[in-house]
Amino acid sequence: MAHKFLIKKNKAGEFVAYFVYNSETIFWTEGYASKASAKNAIESIKKNGPEAEIDDQTD
């Protein structure tokens, strides 16, 4: 599989969820105090992301 979510700890000791595609980080979340919160963030992205609109503010 070329894409996946990773959970890592940042320098502050917080749990951060990363979305990685072909070994390249595409985006990451804020830091969370618990691993469970980072997992909840991943589930929210998976559930709500496919229906998210694109808001192009470049024009």
Curated annotation (Swiss-Prot):
The lineage of its organism: Bacteria, Pseudomonadati, Pseudomonadota, Alphaproteobacteria, Caulobacterales. Belongs to the UPF0339 family. It comes from the Bacteria. It comes from Caulobacter vibrioides (strain ATCC 19089 / CIP 103742 / CB 15). Pfam families: DUF1508 (PF07411). This is UPF0339 protein CC_2965. InterPro entries: DUF1508 (IPR010879), YegP-like_sf (IPR036913).
